[in-house]
Amino acid sequence: LWEFLSDGAMSKQLHPAKAAHDGALAALLASEGFTGASHIFEGKKGILNAMSRDPRPNMLTDNLEHLAERSDVWKINFVSFKVHSSCRHTHAAVDGAIRIADSNSFEIADIADVKIEIYSQALDLLDGVEPVTPWAAKFSLPFCVATALRYKDCTPSRFTEETILDQTTLALAEKISFDTKEDLDSMYPAAWPSRVMVRLQNGASYETQVDYPAGDPETDVTTEQLSEKFRSLAYPYLEHNTDSVIELVMQRTYAPKARELTDVIGHK
């Protein structure tokens, strides 16, 4: 359900917060003795039968017999972190743009054009999306790549009512074209690759390919990257307390108690 992209509606950004809210609410209700259906998945009127004419409930527990002894099958070990504040399908191109901007010396005005090559499934979602709202801008491949080339990042502050009207970024986005390539299609979904080519007015050109976006298990993610992502999200609300929260969480071998966190967050 991606129809929100057609008009830049706000619904998608509510989804993860609502999921976290519902998980916390379920735990609180259970702690007070609230009950739910004991066979919600496999029951005759459960989720599987509601969603499929041929449900296979055994797949829920297949290969779990030796799970405790096999850390390699725990999916949490293969979670990707979203380093950039845009659609995940844009991240390889954003990483490529940042790599080129970091490795070479040129001004935004020096850029003649930028070509992005990407896998087809990405354009199924991103093609035609215009940065008409801050949320829609996160799904605009030209806007995201232009932002990355200009600022060498794609933080939340790059997607505001003001930045989506910034003529320098928009003019650069107009120079960016994109297309699909079969060799990149063949890599997806094991990899989410992109190829970025930047040509300057003087004829110089730079090209790079990113197979795995920053934050993927194959690339790892550094503590500093995670900390910087937290700062960019939390600073408008916690201001200078962000580093205190990072220190409390990162310098522990165990999770801090909720009271410890609220004490830090509550003192501005």
What are these regions (language model features)?
Residues 4-21, 28-268:
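Terminal-appendage/accessory-domain detector
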